[in-house]
Design a protein with these regions (language model features):
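Short phosphate/oxyanion-binding micro-motifs
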Residues: 1-152, 156
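Short, well-ordered beta-to-alpha junction loops that form the rim of enzyme active sites
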Residues: 160-163
C-alpha cells in the first residue's frame, strides 16, 4: 500500500527518532487506540510497534489526535480476535511513510523516507514456546522472506515481541 504525497524525512542528523514496542494484549476495547496515542505523546515516541492488537483483517486508521494506526490481523472477520500487530505513527512520522505491507497476522512492514537512506521497520509477534513447531517455522520463514525483500540499502529495524 503506497502513500501518494511524497513524505518529509523520518530520520536525519538533526532529528532524534524515538521508537518503542508495546505488547498491549488487546486493542479490542473502546478508547484503547486513543490511550495508546496519549502514551506515545507522553513519552515522545514517533513509531510504536504493537503486539497482540487483536483486530481482524488489515488496514489503516487515522485517529482524531492525528496519529495513524497501521494494523494486520487474521484475514477473516469471523476469526477469533487473536494475535495481530500494528504500528502507531505520530503526526510527524506519518508524513514520511512511503509504503506499508500487512504481511500476515504476525508481521507488518513499513518503509519511511529519511535524509540519506530509507528506513524499513518490521513489527513482529512471534509464536510462544508452547506453539507447535510448524507455526514457529512458518513465522521465521515469513520473517526471513520479508527481510530478503527489504532493499539492501535501507536501514532495517526488526522489533516486536519475539517470545523467547
Amino acid at each position: 500500500m503506497t502513500q501518494r504525497n511524497l513524505p518529509t524525512t523520518l530520520l536525519s542528523p538533526k532529528n532524534v527518532l524515538r521508537i518503542g514496542v508495546w505488547n498491549i494484549r488487546t486493542m479490542y476495547q473502546t478508547g484503547r487506540a486513543a490511550q495508546v496515542a496519549r502514551e506515545m505523546d507522553r513519552y515522545g515516541i514517533h513509531v510504536l510497534g504493537l503486539s497482540e492488537v487483536r483486530w481482524t483483517t488489515a488496514g489503516k486508521v487515522t485517529l482524531s489526535s492525528g496519529h495513524t494506526l497501521l494494523f494486520s490481523g487474521p484475514p477473516d472477520e469471523g476469526d477469533a480476535h487473536r494475535n495481530g500487530v500494528g504500528l502507531m505513527l505520530s503526526r510527524q512520522s506519518v508524513k514520511s511513510l512511503m509504503e506499508w505491507e500487512p504481511d500476515n497476522e504476525r508481521i507488518l512492514t513499513a518503509r519511511f523516507k529519511s535524509k540519506f537512506q530509507e528506513v524499513t521497520v518490521v513489527q513482529c509477534y512471534a509464536p510462544t514456546n508452547v506453539a507447535d513447531q510448524e507455526s514457529k517455522e512458518d513465522f521465521y520463514e515469513c520473517l526471513q522472506g520479508v527481510l530478503d525483500r527489504t532493499p539492501k540499502r535501507d536501514i532495517t529495524i526488526v522489533m516486536g515481541n519475539m517470545n523467547a
